Amino acid sequence: MAKDKVVLAYSGGLDTTVIIPWLKENYDYDVIAVCIDVGQGDDWAAIKSRALKTGASACYVVDARKEYIEEYIWPALKANAVYEDEYLLGTSTARPLIGKILVEYARQEGAVAICHGATGKGNDQVRFELAIKAFAPDLKVIAAWRDDKWNMDGREAEIAYLEKRGLEVPMKKDQSYSRDENIWHLSHEGLELEKTENEPNYKHMLKNTVVPEEAPAEGEYVTIDFEKGIPVGLNGKKMDALSLLTELNKIGGRNGVGLVDICENRCVGMKSRGVYETPGGAILYFAHRMMDHLCLDRDTYHYKQQLSIKVAELIYDGKWFTTLFDSCMAFVDKTEETVTGWAKVKLCKGAIRGAGSGSKYSLYNESIASFTTGDLYDHKDAQGFITLFGLPLKVRAMMEQNVGEGQAIIESKSFKKRPTE
């Protein structure tokens, strides 16, 4: 009789490698390992071999890099979605896609369950499982680290588990940072970062970005072309999404841009400190905001600023496949219809500065904005505007004076006595 199948989100790391024999021993399932390439830069042939040697019945490697950029990163970019002012959502944007692909393989294989190796303290367990619930509410989810049958409390126990069974151990016992990498970012947690008073050891930590102080002093100029809010060209050359982001990561990395050290609020209730390398992403966000400044009117831009916070929160919390997220993105897509043009930035020792922008949809009109007098704007027009714009303040002051409290209220407003000489 054929065994039931479980689809495992397999990264090739220690946790998910241990989970393969653990699932077979504790659930008697055939394990279907699914590796999803979102730009980790891993040796997928070696990882597939490891999964099969460790006991997986099958292992599939999915190149999802293009899909990840175009369907997850670009929407977040168009929305200017930044979590808690700094985090560009590198891990958060990848998890909904991974969850969706896991469901697709579960359906294809006729699996009864999906398993992941996310810890019980992190955000990823939430993100994976919300995606699974959105597409396959009938499927069982096995979260190994929360399972009653899981009796390993750390790396040493996991290594011992594999060694006892004569299986390959995909890492050494020495300490290292806990990292998550994809085409958009690289995150670092653990070691000295677990104490907030410690400065990050950037020289030891960084992989894709130079320490800003060691970046070239002359800096570098970059021009990004946008069509409806989506990056389509770099320095005058049309490029596909993967090539463009790959090249921008190199350019940003050698100029030390996109480093973030943040103590963020996890959706599970605790704070967590991490250092993020997002060199290409930082450039794109800066350039895209330049385009929004140029092409969006005041009311739309200000409302989008508020909405961006909510979109970032939804992405961070794993609520990508929700009605609210779809509704927010419908607004974002409307705002981006005219965000077409180019933005030029200068990168220098970790800093990004604007160096010009242009668009046929630009709402900047030099003849109006110029300090010289022109036909389109009469300085005297401001008089009526100021009268009406300031009317609420004037009416309130008149009321205060009429009720006999005017002088007391005026004196309470912390006015200073100024010198008269």
Regions found by a protein language model. Give the residues of each.
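Nucleotide-activated chemistry modules centered on ATP-dependent adenylation/adenylyltransferase
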Residues: 2-9, 14-421
